Every structure is written in structure tokens, then in C-alpha cells.
A protein has these predicted regions:
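Conserved catalytic-core segments centered on acid/base and nucleophilic motifs
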Residues: 115-116, 128, 162-164, 169-170, ...
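Iron-sulfur (Fe-S) cluster-binding segments and ferredoxin-like electron-carrier domains
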Residues: 128-140
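C-terminal accessory regions of radical SAM enzymes
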Residues: 309-368
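Flexible, acidic/Gly-rich N-terminal and inter-domain linker regions that tether
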Residues: 1-107
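Residues that line or immediately flank small-molecule/substrate-binding pockets and catalytic motifs
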Residues: 132, 166, 290
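Conserved, mostly hydrophobic/aromatic
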Residues: 59, 125, 286
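Conserved AdoMet/S-adenosylmethionine-binding subsite of the radical SAM
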Residues: 147-161, 170-318
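N-terminal pre-triad scaffold of radical SAM enzymes
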Residues: 52-55, 101-129
Length: 368
């Protein structure tokens, strides 16, 4: 395990330059992290031996104080190795492999497939649903595995929507990313209403990676969508606004997938500020996820009622554009299941009784 973690200040760079590798490879030791935050060195080493840590210089600079919403997302915690509740793979991405489906593909829904093209990220989030494998050099996708996945997509004509995921696809060099993207595009563009999506946290944790060259390349493969991952208002900065603006100016619609995290964003005001900030930089709030029961992340989980409370605090109290779906990705591979507060009170052949955001009741008369 690489025990070096990147910690330093924010940087400006030329949009046409490739990202500086030093921004994501290590240059500060666990000794220094221990000293900065007053954390036991032996404990840090034990955590990082099991769950690798990586923090971009930029993201570290957003920490204002120990224990804040940025700190909790990126700094290793002893709670990770004390967790006895969770599962390594609660969504059954690997432990329930379907015969004939390549290891890099999850084909859970009829017309969609998830394609994991990287196992590296600019930052290893402490609550990651794939923390069992992200950052492990032995689990880096090979080109042979990628070819098998492409062949699967080609053979399954029902797939019209491919989500490139990881890890983080934007951690690949532009040339390799385009090579994979082009192969997927050649298949999907021939299918009715075919689209490609990319899931990435780069605009949030390493926005310097979004360059004009990258955006120019992505523009060649429309219709292309990006799902970002912002979890706290402090992540919305001039740098992340610039990165998202460049992607939006390239004609790429963006959605955001937030994870509900205890001590990070589990209150209505924080979540409302985040959702409004996202919309202001042309990113549509898409999902709020109930935190998955991943081994090593139980300390991040809230009660489901907390998510419903937050959803209810958004609906009617801010513009509809700012209200995402609240979902649980069902353990055991059941897929995303949306949850709603009790707006529908009763329903029969004659009428429907509804409750609005002010808890007032209204009747809707059914047609004969």
C-alpha cells in the first residue's frame, strides 16, 4: 500500500495543459498527517493498509477545521476498521456475477449498462461503495477486460445507455479515455436514442483536470452526459464552478449524485445550500443516495427518516430544479428505489387526498 498522501494548497493552471501528476500522487507522509491533525500514526497506517487514501492538494485546501464536512470525506478514520456491520459488496456488483457478463460490466437494468473503465480516483472517498477495490493496483482494468466489455455491449442490442464509471474515468489520460469512449460511441450511436454517461468526481475534488483539450475531445461524442458528485456546499468554489462551466459550455448536460452522510450534509440547510449552488453552476441535482451499508463506512450512515426529512424540506421550499430524487440503492442488487414523504394520503375511485409542503390537505376529484 502506498502510504503517501497528497496534501498541499490550491493551484491555478493553463486550461490547455494536462493535469500535473504531482497534484494526485503523494508528497506528504503519514508522519506529517499525524502531526497536522493530531492523529495516531499507527492507527493511520492500519487504516490505510486496508483502505488506501489519496487526497488532491486542491481538495485538502478546502478543509477549514478538523472534523468539518470536507475533512470527514477524505481523512482516514479509525471507525473504518472498527466497523463490523457493513458488507464489502452490498450491491452485489461482484459477489453475484452473472454468467456471461464481463467483470467490468454491471447490467442491472434492461437498457443500461455500467462499464468500469478505471479503478483510480483523484481522491479516495472514505464512504466509497467500491472501497474494497478502488486504488488497488492489482484490480486495474486490463485492455483485454475492456475489450470483453465492449464485445458484450456490442452483442446486447437492448443496451442504449452506457455509463462509464470506475474509479473515475477522468483519471485516465485523454488518449486512453478517448479510445474507450470512441469504441462505445461507435456502438451506441447506431442504436435508437443511444446515449453515453460519465460518472466522475473530478470537477469536485480535482477541477484542474478539466481542460479545454478534454472538453474539445468530449464534444465529439454527443449525446454525452456527466454525473458529478458534490456532497457539501464548501465544494462549490471558483475552481469547481470554472470546471463545470467548461463542461456545460461544451454542450454537456450535468447531473449531480449526492450521498447523504452523517456529520457532512445531514441537515436541511446544508443540503438546500448545496442544491441551490449546483443549479447556479448549471448542474442539475439528480439523486440523493442513502449511504450504502459498505464495510468501513457505517459511521456515515443516517436513519432513512433523515433523508425523507431533508427531501421534504426541499420540496416547496426551493425551486423544483433544486430537488433531486431520494433513493436507496437496494442491498443485494435490487437497484435504485425512490422514497417520498407521505404526500398521497388516500386514493379511491372518487377522489385523491393530497398533502402539500405546508402539510395542508387538498382533494383531487377522479374522472368518471
Amino acid at each position: 500500500m502506498n502510504q503517501i498522501i497528497t496534501l498541499a494548497g490550491r493551484q491555478e493552471k493553463n486550461d490547455d495543459e494536462p493535469p500535473d501528476p504531482s497534484a494526485i500522487s503523494g508528497n506528504i507522509s503519514l508522519d506529517e498527517i499525524s502531526k497536522i491533525f493530531g492523529l495516531p500514526k499507527a492507527s493511520l497506517k492500519q487504516i490505510c493498509d486496508k483502505y488506501p487514501a489519496r487526497i488532491s492538494k486542491y481538495y485538502f485546501s478546502l478543509i477549514k477545521e478538523k472534523g468539518d464536512g470536507i475533512y470527514k470525506q477524505c481523512i482516514p478514520s479509525e471507525a473504518e476498521i472498527l466497523d463490523t456491520f457493513g458488507e464489502e459488496d452490498p450491491l452485489r456488483e461482484e459477489s453475484k456475477i452473472i454468467e456471461g457478463v464481463p467483470s467490468l460490466i454491471t447490467h442491472r437494468y434492461p437498457d443500461r449498462a455500467l462499464f468500469r473503465i478505471s479503478n483510480s480516483c483523484a481522491m479516495y472517498c472514505r464512504f466509497c461503495t467500491r472501497k474494497r477495490k478502488v486504488g488497488d493496483p492489482n484490480k486495474k482494468p486490463t485492455w483485454k477486460e475492456i475489450e470483453k466489455a465492449l464485445s458484450y455491449i456490442q452483442k446486447h442490442s437492448e443496451i442504449r445507455d452506457v455509463i462509464l464509471s470506475g474509479g473515475d474515468p477522468f483519471m485516465l489520460p485523454d488518449e486512453l479515455l478517448e479510445k474507450i469512449l470512441k469504441e462505445v460511441y461507435l456502438i451506441i450511436s447506431k442504436r435508437e436514442n443511444g446515449i453515453i454517461r460519465i460518472g466522475t468526481r473530478v470537477p469536485c475534488v480535482f477541477p484542474q483536470r478539466i481542460t479545454s483539450n478534454l472538453c474539445a475531445m468530449l464534444k465529439r461524442y454527443h449525446p454525452l452526459y456527466i454525473n458529478t458528485h458534490f456532497n457539501h456546499p464548501a465544494e462549490i468554489t471558483p475552481e469547481s464552478r470554472k470546471a463545470c462551466g467548461m463542461l456545460a459550455d461544451a454542450g454537456i448536460p450535468m447531473g449531480n449524485q449526492t450521498v447523504l452522510l452523517k456529520g457532512v450534509n445531514d441537515n436541511p440547510e446544508t443540503m438546500k445550500k448545496l442544491m441551490q449552488g449546483l443549479v447556479s453552476m448549471r448542474v442539475k441535482p439528480y439523486y440523493i443516495y442513502q449511504c450504502d451499508p459498505i464495510k468501513g463506512a457505517n459511521h456515515f450512515r443516517t436513519k432513512v427518516e433523515k433523508g425523507l426529512e431533508i427531501y421534504k424540506s426541499l420540496r416547496g421550499h426551493t425551486s423544483g430544479l433544486c430537488v433531486p430524487n431520494f433513493v436507496i440503492d437496494a442491498p443485494g442488487g435490487g437497484g435504485k428505489i425512490p422514497l417520498l414523504p407521505g404526500y398521497l394520503q388516500t386514493i379511491d375511485d372518487k377522489k385523491v387526498v393530497l398533502k402539500n409542503y405546508e402539510n395542508k390537505l387538498f382533494e383531487y376529484i377522479q374522472p368518471d
